[in-house]
Amino acid sequence: MLTTNILCLIIPILLAVAFLTLVERKILGYMQFRKGPNIVGPYGLLQPAADATKLFTKEPLHPLTSSKFMFTIAPTLALTLALTLWIPLPMPYPLIDLNLGILFILAVSSLAVYSILWSGWASNSKYALIGALRAVAQTISYEVTLAIILLSLVLTNGSFTLSTLTTTQEHMWLVLPTWPLTMMWFTSTLAETNRAPFDLSEGESELVSGFNVEYAAGPFALFFMAEYANIILMNSLTTALFFGAFHNPSLPELHTINFITKTLILTTMFLWIRASYPRFRYDQLMHLLWKNFLPLTLAMCMWHVSTSISFASIPPQT
């Protein structure tokens, strides 16, 4: 039974990842006054299948000087961690209802840094190594603000369980009382997933393709899938944290439709931002976090602690 449940979780995620690549190419195409993929299948709908067939039938190449074991294990680890992150997410029922679901997501997303670091180091290429070091520094830095924002929300929510966030937001979305945190969270998720305008690790003009420059065929596809699975996950998490979905115990289907719609809107915003903004400079990226976001999130965290105490109001308990 558990195997069936796991497959029912993994297969839709992989399908969503496949079609997200098509949606991205379509959106970028229309924003640049062209059609995007429209040859393979009706309206280009079979393009993801064609891409997958091409990538997984090509021969995976290993550079002669690379560390074979780590070179192979890094993309596998990246996708495994990206799929593991979905376990505690309520849609409307999680695969495993963890008491510390928020901490679980934070801990597992921190481990994703290792797959990037290993891939850059094992490739034995200076471009890949510089890209990996940039990505690791960026990911670790932005996790600091993500953790503090999550702490503020936990203080508001009164529980580390993600499913109680739905109960907390039955009358009002958390985006309304915590809108500065929402804006910083959304920007930090862009940086955390290495998306434009924070795609410093994949700067084509400087590093060719960043940490995955030596990867081809299947292993490259695994990295690609992990990146897009993380994008959808981060937007699903944003929906759960700030835009609590409509919840009616007698109609759980409406919760799912609502959840998917909000996630889709946020994901489209990710793609829209990619088409609209140029890449940040590396020092600007770090300045934004350490000089702007960190003091602000700490101040907001203290604000959330003090308001609860001063008004003698306790958050909803589980």
UniProtKB/Swiss-Prot annotation:
GO cellular component terms given for this protein: mitochondrial inner membrane
Compartments, record wording: Mitochondrion inner membrane
Source organism, top-level taxon: Eukaryota
GO biological process: aerobic respiration
The entry's keywords: Electron transport, Membrane, Mitochondrion, Mitochondrion inner membrane, NAD, Respiratory chain, Translocase, Transmembrane, Transmembrane helix, Transport, Ubiquinone
Family annotation (InterPro entries): NADH_UbQ_OxRdtase_su1/FPO, NADH_UbQ_OxRdtase_su1_CS
Regions crossing the membrane: 3-23, 69-89, 100-120, 135-155, 171-191, 213-233, 253-273, 294-314
Keyword Transmembrane helix: yes
Keyword Protein transport (UniProt): no
Record membrane topology: Multi-pass membrane protein
Catalytic activities: a ubiquinone + NADH + 5 H(+)(in) = a ubiquinol + NAD(+) + 4 H(+)(out)
Enzyme Commission code(s) on record: 7.1.1.2
GO molecular function, one term: NADH dehydrogenase (ubiquinone) activity
Pfam families to which the protein is assigned, alphabetical: NADHdh
Class of the enzyme per the UniProt entry, highest EC level: translocase
Function: Core subunit of the mitochondrial membrane respiratory chain NADH dehydrogenase (Complex I) that is believed to belong to the minimal assembly required for catalysis. Complex I functions in the transfer of electrons from NADH to the respiratory chain. The immediate electron acceptor for the enzyme is believed to be ubiquinone.
Family (UniProt): Belongs to the complex I subunit 1 family.
PANTHER family in the record: NADH DEHYDROGENASE SUBUNIT 1, NADH-UBIQUINONE OXIDOREDUCTASE CHAIN 1
Name of the protein: NADH-ubiquinone oxidoreductase chain 1
Encoding gene, per UniProt annotation: MT-ND1
